[in-house]
UniProtKB/Swiss-Prot annotation:
It comes from Xanthomonas campestris pv. campestris (strain ATCC 33913 / DSM 3586 / NCPPB 528 / LMG 568 / P 25). One of its GO terms (molecular function) is phosphoribosylamine-glycine ligase activity. It is found in: Cytoplasm. This is Phosphoribosylformylglycinamidine cyclo-ligase. Its EC number is 6.3.3.1. PANTHER family: TRIFUNCTIONAL PURINE BIOSYNTHETIC PROTEIN ADENOSINE-3, TRIFUNCTIONAL PURINE BIOSYNTHETIC PROTEIN ADENOSINE-3-RELATED. Belongs to the AIR synthase family. The lineage of its organism: Bacteria, Pseudomonadati, Pseudomonadota, Gammaproteobacteria, Lysobacterales. GO terms for biological process: 'de novo' IMP biosynthetic process; adenine biosynthetic process; purine nucleotide biosynthetic process. Keywords: ATP-binding, Cytoplasm, Ligase, Nucleotide-binding, Purine biosynthesis.
């Protein structure tokens, strides 16, 4: 018997590497040392930082991956994977430096894997982050035919003096919410149940003219480049930041707020995007459940000094980022630290 007889095709893996090399190399930065194929990937950190603090993150895309496989949409799920990781390390002011991925499947389909990794490379390129390595694991009997799993890993850096840890947050600080591109990569176990209960309406068009499946599969917004530019020009105005992921608005912003303080969020400050309105209506989802499951149209939040909030908003306008003042930091009232109304 051979390894191929057992279900592992080394030649297919090598063919995939050759297919993705040009895509991966487009994401490289000058600090990347060497190419693909080594036992470890190399990145030279010596030239840019005085006192670098490394910030690491890892994530997946949840069961959005199941929907992507169901719909045969493999080309953008890699962007989601990158977004979930790089937006997280961005919260602490870090510039994502490099990214690694893990792709696991029962039987390697080169076209599918190349589409997925192409999306990862594109997400890295859009985030200024080098895709310097990864693992493609072909594991017979571990996954049903046509299915695969993904995980991503990123490392960023920030000057120690510029690290954002929430310590500067004060009562009265303003919450500026930046628009999401859709559900991003959270809440998809509920989304898939609602979609199936509604009869999997692949042809349905939402009130804004966007097809439902396009809205559900819209790639996670990549906030890295605009937010890094904002930190460079208005960093003193930003006291904390939050990436709105699993747990929604209720559980994510509060993670960067010190004890003794809470949040008063004005849900009338922005209009619930059509895809979320459809999900709430079709799934009969209560408001409180919406807030703690989905981003509801707000993908990233700046906690800003009130005197400088207007300048931040002007800078966001200049970058064509939709945004709203969605609330403020208040003194916490007992155990209830987040009020949305």
């Amino acid at each position: 018997m051979t390894y191929r007889d057992a279900g592992v095709d080394i030649d297919a893996g090598n063919a995939l590497v050759e297919r993705i090399k040009p895509l991966v190399k487009r994401s490289f930065r000058p600090e990347v040392m060497g190419g693909l194929g080594g036992f470890g990937a190399l990145f030279d950190l010596s030239g840019k930082y005085k006192e670098p603090v490394l910030v690491s993150g890892t994530d997946g895309v949840g069961t959005k991956l199941k929907l992507a496989q169901q719909l045969g949409r493999h080309d953008t799920i890699g962007i989601d994977l990158v977004g979930m990781c790089v937006n997280d390390v961005l919260v602490q002011g870090a510039e994502p430096l490099f990214f690694l991925d893990y792709f696991a499947t029962g039987k390697l389909d080169i076209d599918t894997a190349a589409a997925v990794v192409g999306g990862i490379a594109r997400g890295c390129e859009l985030s200024g982050c080098a895709l310097i390595g990864g693992e493609t694991a072909e594991m017979p009997d571990m996954y049903p035919p046509g299915e695969y799993d993904l995980a991503g890993f990123t490392v960023g850096a920030v000057e120690k003096s510029q690290l954002l840890d929430g310590a500067q947050v004060r009562e009265g600080d303003v919450l500026i919410g930046i628009a999401s591109s859709g559900p991003h990569s959270n809440g998809y176990s509920l989304i898939r149940k609602i979609y199936e209960r509604a009869g999997s309406p692949a042809d349905l068009v939402l009130d804004d003219g966007v097809a439902l499946i396009d809205a559900l599969m819209a790639p996670t917004a990549l906030y890295v480049k605009p937010i890094l530019a904002l930190l460079k020009s208005h960093g003193e105005a930003i006291h904390a930041m939050a990436h709105v992921t699993g747990g929604g608005l209720t559980e994510n912003i509060i993670r960067v707020i010190p004890d003794g303080l809470g949040l008063d969020i004005d849900a009338t400050a922005w209009i619930l995007p059509p895809v979320f309105a459809w999900l709430q209506r079709e799934g009969a989802v209560a408001d409180a459940e919406m807030w703690r499951t989905f981003n509801c149209g707000i993908g990233f939040v700046l906690v800003a000094a009130p005197a400088q909030a207007a300048a931040l908003e002007q800078a966001l306008d200049a970058q064509s980022l939709a945004h709203w003042r969605i609330g403020q930091v208040v003194t916490a009232q007992g155990d209830e630290r987040v009020r949305i109304g």
